[in-house]
């Protein structure tokens, strides 16, 4: 765990809710003072009212009644203060956690793809749920309790000195013993709370993975192995939790018993002093002091109770800050995408949907040049590896002229999808260059680069919402009519209109109520509504049956018309009309040409096409 985790958390809390926290502290001080005053008044109540009344033959209880009312008012004021600061802390807690979740989500959205490739999704979810909940307990309960306990110790200590110094010294000695014991037990359990939170994240990650892949688990009869793996992770969580709570849970009982010992010792010593008339110790003073002694020792027990919560919150905060400290996706691009129209023979920027695009390229002399968006995509001498010591692509050259359809084929792991990831700048290359209309893509803002590329990903992902919402995800300002037109273009309209509520049918669980082909069609419609200048179709038709594939291919041909298109497909029949087909093998392009020329060569592509060898 990084040092200063708790300091950083408290600094964030203070910066957002300074006024609220000041008012909370004032209320806590008020609560402590009113309670101490009530206890101190017991001395007056006993010595000045109760004892004289017991000795009087005709007692007058009016004075005692007024004294009791004063005590009741003091305690009532303490209750009001306690109620007020607790209500404020509830508001502060929920507001702070809301803001923190927003900060976490906004930062998560800025993280590079490699973070999600390397971090289990369930572990990230655990940060949003379990780790956030540890902060809820810390802010709403532990912090107020710790401040209240400290205030109680201070005010009680001062009051005890006023009443009797020898008994106060005795109480402080016992308090030191309690502090030493509490610190020792707390240090033994603290490090295990960090491991407990990490193990909890692993368990959640595994559960999320198993839920997502439950069909695969059942198809391959993997249930027993899945259960065994879960048992192992769960046992590790149980062990770390046991070690964390083994000492932490005995803190409260130990401190309570030490407090009782302190109370008994003070009672015995105080009684001896009172009976012998030392230090002017009256019955009222002794009763008030013993009550204060309870109040003096009780905060130590309360503090020990919060040690568990503080340790867990510190571990949770550490994981939260690990997420927040992840480096955001680097983007130093200056070139942006804009719509253009031709006015008096010149290209000018416009807000109209003209269907024509250009790159706004700021030059060193200060003027902005409009470069027509043609869709000329080139990779030259590209080397790339997800890890520096393991290259996935080797000296790759790809030339996609405007309006051309370029197809990539090859075995799984050959590097086809990696090429499209590089064009999107999900990853940056180690060597070579990638240009878009003659502009190095590192100069293009990532948002604009990706906006220019309509993508149908290999894994179709649909979001909870209506069919219309999922199509509109391609362009949020698209009208219903535009979404329907896009669906018709992808031939998705044929099945959507037969759904129970048509385009307003709710999809849940990643579109589990749709077939693979239907989900793929919606993904294509989503790309169509974006109306991008260029397209990347990653395994676009690999999940669609032959009949649906024919419908999709017809729609895709319309969508690809006039656009530069990069296609990855396992079904070679879908790419026969490509302008250029590139065959990849272990990160190298070993063949390139159109369908006819590659068939004539009778090389790897010919073998794939004739079925002599399998791609996967």
Language-model features and meaning:
Residues 2-3, 26-27, 34-47, 74-121, ...:
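Juxtamembrane helix-loop junctions of ABC transporter transmembrane domains
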Residues 52, 159-173, 243, 247-318, ...:
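Helix-loop-helix
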Residues 21-84, 161-166, 264, 268, ...:
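Transmembrane helix-loop-helix hairpins at lipid-water interfaces of multipass membrane proteins
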Residues 7, 81, 85, 93, ...:
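Hydrophobic alpha-helical transmembrane segments of ABC transporter permease domains
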Residues 15-18, 113-114, 132-139, 143, ...:
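An intracellular "coupling" helix at the cytosolic face of ABC transporter transmembrane type-1 domains
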Residues 57-58, 340-616:
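ABC-type nucleotide-binding domain
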Residues 16, 20-33, 74, 141-195, ...:
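Transmembrane helices of ABC transporter permease
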Residues 94, 102-134, 205-229, 322-340, ...:
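Short intracellular "coupling" helices and adjacent cytoplasmic loop segments at the cytosolic face
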């Amino acid at each position: 765990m990084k040092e200063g985790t708790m300091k950083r958390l408290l600094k964030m809390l203070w910066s957002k809710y300074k006024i609220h926290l000041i008012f909370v502290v004032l209320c806590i001080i008020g609560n402590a003072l009113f309670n101490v005053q009530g206890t101190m008044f017991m001395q007056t109540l006993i010595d000045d009212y109760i004892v004289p009344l017991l000795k009087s033959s005709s007692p007058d209880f009016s004075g005692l009644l007024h004294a009791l009312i004063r005590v009741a008012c003091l305690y009532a004021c303490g209750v009001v203060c306690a109620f007020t600061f607790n209500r404020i802390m509830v508001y502060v807690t929920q507001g702070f956690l809301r803001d923190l979740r927003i900060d976490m989500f906004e930062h998560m959205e800025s993280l590079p793809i490699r973070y999600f490739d390397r971090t289990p999704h369930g572990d990230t979810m655990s940060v949003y749920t379990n780790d956030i909940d540890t902060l809820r307990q810390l802010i709403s309960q532990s912090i107020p309790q710790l401040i209240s306990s400290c205030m109680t110790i201070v005010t009680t200590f001062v009051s005890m000195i006023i009443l009797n110094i020898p008994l106060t010294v005795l109480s402080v000695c016992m308090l030191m013993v309690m502090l030493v014991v509490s610190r020792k037990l707390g240090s033994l359990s603290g490090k295990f709370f960090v491991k407990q939170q990490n193990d909890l994240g692993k368990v959640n990650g595994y559960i999320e993975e198993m839920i997502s892949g439950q069909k695969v688990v059942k198809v391959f009869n993997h249930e027993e192995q899945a259960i065994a793996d879960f048992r192992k992770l769960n046992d590790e969580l149980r062990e770390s939790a046991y070690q964390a709570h083994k000492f932490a849970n005995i803190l409260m009982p130990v401190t309570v018993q030490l407090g009782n010992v302190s109370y008994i010792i003070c009672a015995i010593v105080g009684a001896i002093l009172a009976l012998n008339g030392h230090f002017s110790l009256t019955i009222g003073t002794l009763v008030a002091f013993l009550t204060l002694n309870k109040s003096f020792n009780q905060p130590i027990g309360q503090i020990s109770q919060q040690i568990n919560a503080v340790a867990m919150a510190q571990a949770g905060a550490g994981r939260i800050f690990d997420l927040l400290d992840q480096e955001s996706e680097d983007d130093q691009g200056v070139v942006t995408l804009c719509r253009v129209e031709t006015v008096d023979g010149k290209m000018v920027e416009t807000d109209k949907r003209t269907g024509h695009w250009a790159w706004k390229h700021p030059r060193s002399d200060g003027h902005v040049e409009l470069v027509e968006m043609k869709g000329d995509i080139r990779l030259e001498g590209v080397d790339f590896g997800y890890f520096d010591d393991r290259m996935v692509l080797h000296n790759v050259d790809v030339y996609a002229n405007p309006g051309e359809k370029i197809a990539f084929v090859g075995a799984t792991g050959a590097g086809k999808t990696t090429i499209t990831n590089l064009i999107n700048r999900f990853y940056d290359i180690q060597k070579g260059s990638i240009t878009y209309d003659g502009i190095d893509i590192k100069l293009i803002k990532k948002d604009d680069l990706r906006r220019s590329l309509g993508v149908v990903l290999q894994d179709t992902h649909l979001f909870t919402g209506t069919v219309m919402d999922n199509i509109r995800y391609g362009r949020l300002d698209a009208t219903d009519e535009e979404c329907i037109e896009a669906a018709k273009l992808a031939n998705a309209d044929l099945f959507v209109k037969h759904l129970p509520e048509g385009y307003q049918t709710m999809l849940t669980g990643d579109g589990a109520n749709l077939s693979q082909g239907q989900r793929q069609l919606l993904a294509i419609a989503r790309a169509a509504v974006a109306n991008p200048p260029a397209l990347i179709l990653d395994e676009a038709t690999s999940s669609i049956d032959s009949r649906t594939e024919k419908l999709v291919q017809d729609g895709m041909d319309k969508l690809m018309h006039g656009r530069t298109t990069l296609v990855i497909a396992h079904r070679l029949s879908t790419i026969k009309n490509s302008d250029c087909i590139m065959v990849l093998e272990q990160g190298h392009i070993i063949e390139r040409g159109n369908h006819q020329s590659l068939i004539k060569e009778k090389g790897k592509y010919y073998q794939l096409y004739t079925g002599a060898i399998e791609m996967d």
